[in-house]
Design a protein with these regions (language model features):
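RNase H-like, metal-dependent nuclease domains and their acidic two-metal-ion catalytic environment used
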Residues: 1-96, 103, 107, 120-195
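Short, surface-exposed amphipathic charged segments that create phosphate/polyanion-binding patches used
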Residues: 105-115
């Protein structure tokens, strides 16, 4: 699959600060929104400081990439959302209700995985987060749960939110004027920002 030079990114953010990891996932669709590519991710180990660790990465992405939206759990991310809104990115922030919409997100992720329409970056930490997650069938559909309570699954949850956003939203990516001195074009940009 060819990689776009200037992709539209759909972000999913699963926030935790004290005892659990925090994960940000970026995916991009193909031209027809039939397949999706895992463009990059950051997983922060606890304790996580949202203002000094997560916010700079989000601001860097919103400034230098075409971001269609950020799907996130509003319960833990109030400060992040307020700061991003103050910086003019409020229209790209989409709250995900953890009771109702996460079932939809899990169902969408399940469909893409079983239909082999999602390409993931080979990464041991990603593999671990996915292996520690399980899908539980409920009357509303699939729900993402932890197999072992002490193992993190935040990447899986963030991926599900990003996938849900990408499969629902089309044509919302905006982008400031491009400058080769200012903008980065690399699928590994998240690694360099998070370091």
């Amino acid at each position: 699959m060819k990689r776009e030079l200037d992709p539209v990114l759909y972000l999913g953010l699963d926030v935790a600060t004290k005892r659990d990891t925090c994960a940000l996932v970026a995916i991009t669709p193909d031209d027809n929104f039939e397949s999706y590519i895992h463009w990059g991710h950051v997983i922060w180990q606890p304790p996580v400081d949202l203002v000094t660790q997560v916010l700079p990465v989000l601001l860097e992405l919103f400034t230098n990439q075409r971001i269609a939206g950020l799907w996130y759990d509003p319960y833990q991310a109030i400060t992040l959302a307020q700061t991003l809104k103050a910086k003019g990115h409020g229209y790209k922030l989409l709250e995900v209700n953890q009771q109702t919409q996460m079932t939809q997100a899990a169902n969408t992720l399940h469909s893409l995985l079983t239909e082999n329409r999602l390409t993931l970056i080979p990464d041991d930490e990603v593999r671990a987060h996915l292996s520690w997650a399980s899908a539980k069938q409920t009357e509303r559909g699939w729900r993402i749960i932890k197999l072992v309570q002490t193992k993190p699954i935040d990447f899986t949850v963030a991926l599900a939110m990003a996938i849900m956003g990408a499969t629902q939203e089309h044509g919302h990516g905006t982008y400031p004027a491009w400058s080769s001195n200012k903008h980065v074009r690399s699928p590994f940009v998240l690694d360099s920002i998070a370091a």
